[in-house]
Amino acid sequence: MAQEQTKRTGGGDEDEGSAGPEAAGQERREKLAEDTDDLLDEIDDVLEENAEDFVRAYVQKGGQ
């Protein structure tokens, strides 16, 4: 005997209206994640090139 599987999604007519804000929110999260990754990569590059200067400047500004 073969069993048939069905996939249910959403609530019918409301799919188009509710997908808009969720899709926009997802795009915003992806953009923020991408921006954060870019910033962290930039920080890594600076630290690789002149970590000593970075640490010295940080300590002079009151860091511990």
Curated annotation (Swiss-Prot):
Keywords: Coiled coil, Isopeptide bond, Ubl conjugation pathway
Protein name per its UniProtKB record: Prokaryotic ubiquitin-like protein Pup
HAMAP family in UniProt: Pup
GO biological process: modification-dependent protein catabolic process; proteasomal protein catabolic process; protein pupylation
Region (Disordered): 1-38
Subunit note: Strongly interacts with the proteasome-associated ATPase ARC through a hydrophobic interface; the interacting region of Pup lies in its C-terminal half. There is one Pup binding site per ARC hexamer ring.
Deamidated glutamine, modified sites: Q64
Pfam families: Pup
Coiled coil location: 24-52
Alphabetical list of NCBIfam families matching this protein: pupylate_cterm
Sequence ranges of Basic and acidic residues compositional bias: 1-11, 25-34
Keyword Coiled coil: yes
Cross-link (Isoglutamyl lysine isopeptide (Gln-Lys) (interchain with K-? in acceptor proteins)) at residue(s): Q64
Sequence segments annotated as region (ARC ATPase binding): 21-58
